[in-house]
Amino acid sequence: ALFPIFYYNKEAFLAQSPQLYKEQLTMSFEKVFEIAPIFRAEPSRTNRHLAEAISIDLEEAFVDYNDVMSRIEEIIKVSIIAVNDYIKNNPDSEFTSTPVPENIPRYTYDDLVDRMQKAGAKTEWGDDLYPSNLKKIGLDGFYFITDWPLGPKPFYVKDSKSNPKISESFDLMFGDLELSSGSTRIEKRDELAQRMCNK
């Protein structure tokens, strides 16, 4: 998606992500990734809503969201090992050593809503999982939230085979901070066209 700004008295456009183009490229290349700056016109002014960041985008054919979560888990482990090795070889560095997670837990959206309600949070099925409510159930470190409601998800996100109200999607969290998100993409043209019309 693009949004306009004025730059030297001319209209220019800043990109968010060429995700839909990358999805098309997977038909030829199977795996497509990009590391690039992204710009977002977020209306919120918090430390959780960055206007600019460096993004790692991955699109891959013939996989589902479980495969993508496993790939992210591998990337996190390799990254932490590399940083810890750097710290060991550079004791004056300002980095802090971090333990490598054995496995990154996966919690379903339904499970977390249930836990939040039991902890006294005012949340209903279909609501976003706000940081204040996540804090009430005491999750920390890395974890995935999976199987979000389909309703608010983009048109290209695949629904669950077992429940059409659920999406094959995830968010990667660290404590109450969202680091990444992803999903299984709809691969059938007719289904994708129908979803676009319904959205």
Regions found by a protein language model. Give the residues of each.
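Metal-assisted phosphate- and nucleotidyl-transfer catalytic regions
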Residues: 1-2, 72-176, 197-199
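A generic structural motif
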Residues: 57-68, 176-178
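Hydrophobic (often cysteine-bearing) scaffold residues that line and stabilize catalytic clefts
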Residues: 68-72, 188
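Active-site pocket scaffolds in enzymes
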Residues: 183-184, 188-199
